[in-house]
Structure formats: structure tokens, C-alpha cells
């Protein structure tokens, strides 16, 4: 059973009842799990998470979206800005577990060419 190395840190940040951000660390990968709605009222919270991770020299980030119900253009903008910042430091952001609706937003907006997207967390972790 390989559970001991999976969870070394777990932080929760709840923004009302619209979005919850859960942070974990698996080996050298920061996992940012987003639950709920990522929109103009919650996007700055996710932006703060990325800023903090960058300041800690955390260059590998997996954004787990299996419980992300909705993403607006403000949420897409935060992800795009984070991708640009990570590219500057030779870091990488990957996404995993997009629902069909969220994946469709990524496809329509062209974001599937910006981010590596995996069906599951485990697939993404193996790709780092």
C-alpha cells in the first residue's frame, strides 16, 4: 500500500460555498484540487495559491479538477497566467480529471493545447 508518501501536507481554503481549494504534496508535485465553481468571485483565491507555490519554488503543479463544476473566463485567465509564470521558470502545470462540461470549455477556448490534460491524477503524476 503506497499511501504514506501521498499525503505530506493538506491545506483547505473555503471561499463561501462556491469553491474549495485543497492542497497536497505527492513527492515533488504540488496537487491543487479545485471543488465547486471557479469564477470571477473565486479566481483570486486560486491565483494566490499559484503565487505562493511559485514563491516556494514549487515548479511541478497538478491541478485536479474532478469536482470542478464550472469555470468562467476569469478562471481560465488565472490558469493561463499561472502557465505563463511556470514556463518562465521551466516549471509545469498539468490538469487532471476534467468533467465533460469543463473539458468542453477548455476545448472551445483552445486551452487543451496549452495544458497537458490527463483523465486521472495517477496518470498525470506518472507523466511528471
Give the ranges of each region predicted by the language model.
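Amphipathic alpha-helical interaction surfaces in cytosolic regulatory modules
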Residues: 38-114
Amino acid at each position: 500500500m503506497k499511501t504514506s508518501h501521498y499525503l505530506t501536507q493538506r491545506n483547505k481554503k473555503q471561499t463561501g460555498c462556491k469553491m474549495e481549494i485543497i492542497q497536497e504534496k505527492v513527492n515533488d508535485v504540488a496537487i491543487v484540487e479545485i471543488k465547486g465553481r471557479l469564477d470571477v468571485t473565486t479566481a483570486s483565491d486560486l491565483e494566490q495559491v499559484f503565487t505562493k507555490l511559485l514563491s516556494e519554488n514549487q515548479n511541478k503543479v497538478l491541478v485536479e479538477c474532478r469536482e470542478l463544476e464550472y469555470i468562467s473566463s476569469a478562471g481560465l485567465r488565472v490558469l493561463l497566467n499561472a502557465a505563463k509564470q511556470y514556463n518562465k521558470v521551466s516549471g509545469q502545470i498539468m490538469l487532471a480529471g476534467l468533467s465533460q462540461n469543463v473539458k468542453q470549455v477548455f476545448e472551445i477556448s483552445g486551452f487543451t493545447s496549452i495544458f497537458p490534460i490527463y483523465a486521472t491524477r495517477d496518470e498525470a503524476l506518472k507523466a511528471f
